[in-house]
Amino acid sequence: MDEFHRYGKEDNSRQQCFLYPLFFQEDLYAISHDHYLDGSSSSEPMEHLSSNDQFSFLTVKRLIGQIRQQNHSIVLFVNCAPNPLADCKKSSYSESVLEGLTLVLEVPFSIRSKYSVEGMNEWKSFRSIHSIFPFLEDKFPHSNYISDARIPYSIHPEILVRTFRRLIRDAPSLHPLRSVLYEYRNSPENLQRSIIVVPRVNTRFFLFLWNYYVYECESILFSLLKRSSHSRSLAHRPFPQRTHFHRKIKHIIIFSRRNSLKSIWLLKDPKINYVRYGERSIIAIKGTHLLVKKCRYYLLLFRQCYFHLWSEPYRVCSHQLSKNCSSSPGYFLRVRMNPLFVRTKMLDELFIADLITNEFDPIVPIVPILGLLAREKFCDVSGRPISKLSWTNLTDDDILNRFDQIWRNLFHYYSGSFGRDGLYRIKYILSLSCAKTLACKHKSTIRVVRKELGPELFQKSFSKEREFDSLPFSSKAAARSQRERIWHSDIPQINPLVNSWQKIQDLKIENLFDQ
């Protein structure tokens, strides 16, 4: 790959004109085959690779020849016959070809990222991560509206090809990409006019498509947001609308400061903050309700005009921050803004000023979490723990690990919230549901299970704030930690309860717009 990168660095025009021949280099597919064996072609390591023992580069070369013919006869996604190229998920040949296509397409973007301007959104071919908790504590106190937007992942393959065409001038290099996309769209599993591009697909090829698609969406959106946030502050009288504002500002009559002290305002552009997690994004806005409606309309119109996508109105949901419970990143988060008074005093002039700021005060939404636990059959509607019958076929360690994983995720996320007393009720429900599940599996009672397995087994799984116990706090630091909030970013995976809640919210919003 270093040779390919040096090849593209020599001359930008050469890189644009001679990208297509790289698809037919056997060395490229040898590299892609090594990536496939190492498990780097997916977000999770491959476990069973026995079919790769008889891997033949001659077969790959024949497959490359079929791509060269441009007759759409290659079989990468269609599951038919005993053809070794049939199953995309199991065939090493198909994975190697897709890996090779991805490596070639990543070349111009990786070169571009090295020369990107500092502070701009850099390209990541198959990795994208955003900071969530600093965003909440820094931006939420200065916002009063939240928009939860879902990125549309059903897109026509030709739109993806055209977005690549804006950067890659070598048109023949996009023919194999177009062939693969159309073949995937016409496969029996995806008989529709669009293809589904989601970050949950493990293959490197679809992760590359997803991140490039999101990169295109965010690059234009970021430029508009930065243009809005870096505008100069000007003196003006209040206008009903901002249409042709720069033209109107020239006709303002400048009065003396003594006469116009009360009538001249400072223009402060609305503060718009953006963060994305997966296929969902949060836009925090400080402004009026009319501004929020305009931003929502702009997002829908932007997707419709730029990507030729019809986005349903419920994909962009806005609500007031202080009155509703938001979901970030897939968890519940209810925010309460507490006024924080800060008094400053100048010693020389004896000047005292009182500053009022909003404090980010997240609280644990116990009622929605109990509703999730009831929906997932951990408890009933009243909050009484019940056994998880669908997990009785698992081993004891798997059952304990699953319950422990749910509790650790919830505790890690809400460890920085005030009023964590409700978490102990959730802990009680999960621990008792775990005990009832084990008792149902062994066809005994909770008392017998506790007697056989021992109470220390439950204490090991549901330890009380073991994350805090592992920190070397002194006595003063321990007392201070009880007053301050400590955020834990060690969330290994999204809580499985979140998917259930997200489906409920989506159905409610869709039904609201259908009425």
Curated annotation (Swiss-Prot):
Which Pfam families has this protein been placed in? Intron_maturas2 (PF01348), MatK_N (PF01824)
GO BP: any one term: tRNA processing
Q: Return the GO cellular component terms, semicolon-separated.
A: chloroplast
Query: Where can this protein be found?
Result: Plastid, Chloroplast
Q: Report a single Gene Ontology molecular function.
A: RNA binding
Keyword field = Chloroplast, mRNA processing, Plastid, RNA-binding, tRNA processing
Residues spanning the membrane: none
> What family is reported?
Belongs to the intron maturase 2 family. MatK subfamily.
Q: What does this protein do?
A: Usually encoded in the trnK tRNA gene intron. Probably assists in splicing its own and other chloroplast group II introns.
Q: Which PANTHER family match?
A: MATURASE K (PTHR34811:SF1)
According to UniProt, the name of this protein is Maturase K
What is the species listed in this Swiss-Prot or TrEMBL entry?
Pinus sibirica (Siberian pine)
